[in-house]
């Protein structure tokens, strides 16, 4: 799997959350992490990403992992540091 393919999978997943959260969501591509197991994608509301106005920031939007081998998506969490969640994939 390529990063482009993983990005498409992540974007479809994030777009599927828009109705639930009530706003347009975007991937923060400059924050994407590549690891041996796959890619870690971050997302936020389009308004917050474009304006930086915290009134439009999402809460609880944990990074998602797209696995390199099969394209499966795993959601992380926000209670622990990101590295704690990523250890399970290494």
Q: Where would I find each of the regions flagged by the language model?
A:
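Charge-dense, low-complexity polyampholytic segments
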Residues: 23, 28-31, 87-90
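Short alpha-helical interface patches
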Residues: 3-6, 82-90
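Exposed beta-strand-loop-beta-strand "reactive/processing" segments of non-cytosolic proteins
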Residues: 26-66
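Short, non-transmembrane alpha-helical segments in secretory-pathway proteins
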Residues: 1-28
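A short, surface-exposed interaction/processing loop segment used at functional sites
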Residues: 60-87
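Aromatic side chains
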Residues: 13, 39-43, 85
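Histidine-/acidic-rich catalytic cores in large beta-rich domains
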Residues: 3, 11, 52-54, 73
